[in-house]
From Swiss-Prot:
InterPro entries: Glucagon, Glucagon_GIP_secretin_VIP. One of its GO terms (biological process) is response to starvation. The gene is gcg. GO terms for molecular function: glucagon receptor binding; hormone activity. GO terms for cellular component: extracellular region. This is Pro-glucagon. Induction: Produced in the A cells of the islets of Langerhans in response to a drop in blood sugar concentration. It comes from Ictalurus punctatus (Channel catfish). The keyword DNA-binding does not apply. Belongs to the glucagon family. Its main location: secreted. X's in the sequence were included by homology with American goosefish sequences. Keywords: Hormone, Secreted. It is found in: Secreted.
């Protein structure tokens, strides 16, 4: 892959992974009856940090697996 294609594929992968993780996180949060209240800024920052970290871990795992990119 050229660097531009790799970056584009990586961005698409991260967007998809973040969306999946966020939906899963919401579903898990909805299952818990007691939810801790956060200020909107803190909540958004926490979710973004979690999703970025998780997407990076998943991408590294995917790179190590040598699998072709998902279409």
């Amino acid at each position: 892959h050229s660097e531009g294609t790799f970056s584009n594929d990586y961005s698409k992968y991260l967007e998809t992974r973040r969306a999946q993780d966020f939906v899963q996180w919401l579903m898990n949060s909805x299952x818990x009856x007691x939810x801790x209240x956060h200020a909107d800024g803190t909540y958004t920052s926490d979710v973004s940090s979690y999703l970025q970290e998780q997407a990076a871990k998943d991408f590294i795992t995917w790179l190590k697996s040598g699998q072709p990119k998902p279409e």
